[in-house]
Amino acid sequence: MSAVSSIFDTPIPSAAKSSPSGSNKRPLAQNGHHSGEKQSKKSKKASKKQLIDLLVQEHARELSQNDSSASTVSTPKKKKKKNASASDINTSASKNVNAAKKKPKEGLKINLQNSKKKRKNFEVLNSSQQHADDALVETSFNGESLKNNSNHSTPVSKKPKKKNKQMPHPLAGTPNLAIKQEPQTPKANGMQRTSAQDSIVVGREKFAWVIHPTPVEDFMINYWEKKPLLIQRKNPSYYSNLLSRAKIDEMLRQNNIEYTKNIDVTSYREGQRETHNPDGRVLPPDMWSFYEEGCSIRMLNPQTYLPGVYEMNVKLQEFFHCMTGANFYLTPPNSQGFAPHYDDIEAFVLQVEGRKHWKLYSPREPAEMLARVSSPNFTQEEIGTPILEVVLEPGDLLYFPRGIIHQASTVPGHHSLHVTMSVYQKNCWADLLELFFPHALAQAAETHFDLRRGIPLNLHQHFGIVHSDSETPARKQLISHIKSLVDKVFSEDAIDSAVDQLAKRFQHDALPPLISNTEQSTTVYGSSFSHNPDGTVSLRVPFTENSTVRLLRCNVLRLVSEEEKLRIYYHTDNSREYHEYEPNFLEIDQDAALGVELLVKMYPHPVAIRDLPVEDKIEFAKSLWEKGLIVVHGQ
């Protein structure tokens, strides 16, 4: 019987540093198969793929039968929860334990390709388990949704550019943007922790809290990437648990926060935007002195240090399937910190303290709609007339899409503190196709002989800026031929690969998961060690073949095929600081990949270890458990 090589089988060199390619890592075991294994490899893989399909279909039938006899849906069967246990175990870090080197076994191997010397800190939440009955809303979008019904004029850019007059602006119905709501708290309060099994549902509930009382479905259909949304709640404490001036001061005293890296000191006076960052650590007296002088304070990564912002972002990243960022802005009374500009993110402004006067402007031209890069600073003359002016008060929210020009200033007698939550940076179709075409072209060139033929000798005489207005028969014939070659580039496999690469990018961008106290007892973060009389330490593996396992989060890992290898990229070992470490990944063989495939397709429902389509089931589960990728129920 083949076995999984434990990730602790070989000591990790202290000087090693992880890299995406893994070229400077020493694998813990080398993948290998005997010749007899090679002959039956395809048949074994086919039979195991059939087993995966049967297990998924059988589980779907069970859920369907349960749905017909129950009043609620989207929850696993209760009898599978009897084995779950909960404890309030607080752990700030898990120790790295190096076991003696074992002889590599044949068959399934999992090779560690990351040299972290210690696990990252995970915040433990005291929470009660709560079932999530909502289903993920899937909404499709197309270009027809970008309409402009307003009569606002849009100034023309000073640069002479060709303009598509048929392209509409994305702002519609601007007089009806405000939603005025009496004080009201949604059912799922923003700081109420849940341990629902589906992380996408949990993320959706958190987003519902952010934009309450606007329903998520209504927002995605009518506002997302289309037009601004203003919510005025008359509830000053709605976002108060995210941060405050007192929490900012405490954060500065307890952490080594640095200018430029973490915090910018800015001002905007008489049409000039300036940055006043000194070098070194941000000390409270210095920062408050800048503030008293009329400067704005921007923090680039509050989620790293402020638990409330981290808790919000780590849940939202599961719903949006992309990096969720945040900045906070602290502005003194009667001042402005930034010039008019537009951003390359979907922006959600959450007003926490004070008041701020916002002005929004239409994109100046169609090319700026849903912008892929942020703009330079604009002058007041370049941006025209606002399409929305509003003063945000504590508890209010303002959303606007990428490309919407904006500026904000405080009003006399009131400071302002707000959080800007951002999503969907570099996450559009163009970004996906940038990943698609290089792989698709390389793949097609191997398959299609025509793509490898040399270009015609006279190509230069028919194309280029000099010949761009030519309509010769030769040019038309060449254009037709090039179009036929482009058609051959399309490949479904290349689309799968491009989406995998986009998801792999997310694994590097993502915040590490937030582990609830319920999950503590069922993951490696709540594991225990036995201290033996001879001075050795043994890790207690809390499962058998009768135990059930599931992924910690829906998006906790991504199986990727690259460099003729299968890799699992994951983010449980990420830092809260953006890209502090290189991407984390494990190299696996095809046998292990089938096990990962089953766990992904069954999520959020558990799988019995005995049903995993791998040779050594316990060792396979143990290797994923040791990296914090699965939760286990049943001893």
Swiss-Prot record:
It comes from the Eukaryota. InterPro entries: JmjC_dom (IPR003347), NO66-like (IPR039994), RIOX1/NO66-like_C_WH (IPR049043). Residues 295-440 form the JmjC domain. Keywords: Chromatin regulator, Dioxygenase, Iron, Metal-binding, Nucleus, Oxidoreductase, Repressor, Transcription, Transcription regulation. GO terms for biological process: negative regulation of DNA-templated transcription. Transmembrane segments: none annotated. Fe cation binds at residues 341, 343, 406. One of its GO terms (molecular function) is histone H3K4me/H3K4me2/H3K4me3 demethylase activity. GO terms for cellular component: nucleolus; nucleus. It catalyses: N(6),N(6)-dimethyl-L-lysyl(36)-[histone H3] + 2 2-oxoglutarate + 2 O2 = L-lysyl(36)-[histone H3] + 2 formaldehyde + 2 succinate + 2 CO2. Its cofactor is Fe(2+). Residues 141-156 have a biased composition (Polar residues). Binds 1 Fe(2+) ion per subunit. Its EC number is 1.14.11.-, 1.14.11.27. Residues 84-99 have a biased composition (Low complexity). It holds the Pfam family RIOX1_C_WH. Belongs to the ROX family. NO66 subfamily. This is Bifunctional lysine-specific demethylase and histidyl-hydroxylase NO66. It comes from Aedes aegypti.
